[in-house]
Swiss-Prot record:
Pathway(s) the chain acts in: Porphyrin-containing compound metabolism; protoporphyrin-IX biosynthesis; 5-aminolevulinate from L-glutamyl-tRNA(Glu): step 2/2
Cofactor requirements of the protein: pyridoxal 5'-phosphate
Native source organism of the sequence: Glaesserella parasuis serovar 5 (strain SH0165) (Haemophilus parasuis)
GO annotation, cellular component aspect: cytoplasm
Coiled coil start-end: none
Subcellular location: Cytoplasm
InterPro entries: 4pyrrol_synth_GluAld_NH2Trfase, Aminotrans_3, Aminotrans_3_PPA_site, PyrdxlP-dep_Trfase, PyrdxlP-dep_Trfase_major, PyrdxlP-dep_Trfase_small
Pfam annotation, one family: Aminotran_3
N6-(pyridoxal phosphate)lysine modified-residue sites: 265
The family this protein is said to belong to: Belongs to the class-III pyridoxal-phosphate-dependent aminotransferase family. HemL subfamily.
GO molecular function: glutamate-1-semialdehyde 2,1-aminomutase activity; pyridoxal phosphate binding; transaminase activity
Protein name from the UniProt record: Glutamate-1-semialdehyde 2,1-aminomutase
SUPFAM superfamilies, alphabetized: PLP-dependent transferases
Amino acid sequence: MTTSQSLFEKAQRVIPGGVNSPVRAFKGVGGTPVFIDSAKGAYITDSEGKRYIDYVGSWGPMVLGHNHPAIIDAVLKAVPNGLSFGAPTAIEIELAELVCKLVPSIEMVRMVSSGTEATMSAIRLARGYTKRDKIIKFEGCYHGHSDSLLVKAGSGALTLGQPSSPGVPEDFAKHTLTCEYNNLASVKQAFEQYPNDIACLIIEPVAGNMNCIPPKEGFLQGLRELCTQYGAVFIIDEVMTGFRVALGGAQSYYGVTPDLTTLGKIIGGGMPVGAFGGKKEIMEFIAPTGPVYQAGTLSGNPIAMSAGLACLTELSKAGNEQLLAEKTKTLAEGFKALADKHGIPMTVQYVGGMFGLFFTEQTKIESYQDVMKCDVKAFNTFFHKMLEKGVYLAPSAFEAGFMSLAHSDEDIAYTLEMADLALAEMK
């Protein structure tokens, strides 16, 4: 029995499923999850001392690489001053100012402790601001585990939402409309059906929770126009894409301006931080300046703010945005070339510092329906072969991969060398 197997058995006795977030259990790919002891740069080291080149990056935050000196130094300097005050600090102003500078659509920002809190709060704010109840989300997009958003499409092309998890009341889920990602007509139909009832529309600008699906040309702009036309708040969920697709987020990359933006992952530099922000007129509707209530004991935690400020300061240095994109392109196109070499059907999609591998004959993946046609078993086989060879990919066919600035040319070359061997073994 390996150390990870032993730890997993022990964990399952006191933690549901042995993990504190479901995807970590490896249920999507099978086998025992790898328990990690430490990480540095592009590498993670498991409980038995084996090192892996890491393309999960703590599910996105580690854009600079693990254990980055600038972030560690900032945290070590902040810790002696106290871990939490429950009071305003100067450091939270600095981080807020930098966020507003990097993301021009954000005129004011409120810090929270997770991406789920950010999306949940943004939706509550939109409902309070518009005095409407219904929201639009997209099939296959994930915005955290709040009740409004754990909703899937019903049986029709456009139906009232059905809960996708026990514990979410149908009466609550009925306020959530689920449309098809990259299908503007389905969104237009929703607005036409409920012209005065929709408070907001929320979307992942690049769908990273059904692997990596960029928006069709004009799709985000079309959503912006519909929200403006019907008086709905347009929310872009940049928890995953923020500062990774581009410094200004996917919204700057694709040239679209939301009313509200949600952030997470990178904004904390590895610490638990989320944020939501946008137009001053809307943001001032939140307490204490407005009637919509939102609060958090650890919101603006000084240690987390210090880590986030250090991360964004380092990331925003000249050349880093382009370098991250170039590294991702090299890896992604390398995967595709190797799959073609071995005659294994694969489509690879990437944008900025994120990428997705789809085992499929389809040449373009644009929707949840397309993703469902992909060969999950082939991905699972590839995942385990790469894991054996020291490369750690996301343990799910439906999750994006993440590049970091710490991945060297040699790391990427080794990854592709191992992929060459893995794909050869799959023929």
